[in-house]
A protein has these predicted regions:
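Phosphate/nucleotide-binding beta-alpha loop and adjacent structural elements of enzyme active sites
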Residues: 1-217
Length: 217
């Protein structure tokens, strides 16, 4: 889920009161609604029903963890949305270790080597769209939650990032060189930082993290 709260105020989960001072969802507070979503790091697919409310079946999810994929894919497919059991990265077709913390499967990471490793296969988003005959022009919201692999994911999207209007990205080490590199990568492509969500400390890495919201200039 987004750390900005639910996208839809009718969702039974907490909405944006802590972020925006009201009980409406993120899109209401932005006065903007997506036509299509690329969501990288699906985990439990909590957002699928919210995306469906706004853009029907026009959402694409990636989930690197095969266990999470098998457990939650029906949450996405019930809305005829697409999900791929692949790890977004900056190289195609590598077999890599995905580290899965025993009590925090939602924090599985290619970068943070904490937990039990399982094998996953990588793909760049550029290649995924080519192979699956998808068009970047159909998606205007990019949501990235990849536990430390955000820079590699962005590199794998390349200049296609310019097709998105808004980017929500979880940055897993606030104030670090990595954080600055992610920000520079996004802003260099014509986006401006809007705001951070509340900052939290990871129970897995002890690093500070939050969601960052960007809008295309």
């Amino acid at each position: 889920m987004s750390l900005f709260g639910a996208f839809w105020d009718k969702d039974p989960n907490p909405v944006g009161h802590g972020q925006f001072g009201n009980n409406k969802g993120l899109f209401f507070n932005l006065n903007w609604y997506p036509k299509g979503v690329l969501h990288i790091g699906a985990w439990d697919a909590w957002e699928a029903k919210q995306y469906a409310h706004y853009c029907g079946n026009n959402s694409v999810f990636l989930e690197a963890n095969p266990n999470s994929y098998n457990r939650f894919k029906n949450e996405i497919e019930q809305f005829d949305q697409k999900i791929y059991n692949l790890a977004a990265w900056n190289e195609d077709d590598l077999e890599m270790d995905l580290y899965c913390p025993d009590h925090s499967q939602d924090s599985s990471s290619l970068v943070e080597k904490v937990g039990t490793p399982i094998k996953t296969k990588t793909i760049t988003i550029k290649t995924l769209f080519e192979r699956e005959n998808l068009s970047f022009s159909n998606y205007d919201l990019l949501n990235i939650d990849t536990e430390g692999a955000e820079l590699q994911v962005l590199e794998g999207i390349g200049e296609n990032i310019s097709n998105f209007k808004y980017i929500i990205i979880e940055v897993s080490d606030l104030g670090s060189d990595f954080d600055k590199q992610v920000n520079e990568k996004i802003t260099s492509q014509g986006f401006s930082h809007v705001r951070d969500s509340t900052h939290y400390r990871s129970s897995v890495t002890s690093k500070m993290f939050c969601d960052k919201l960007y809008v295309k200039n």
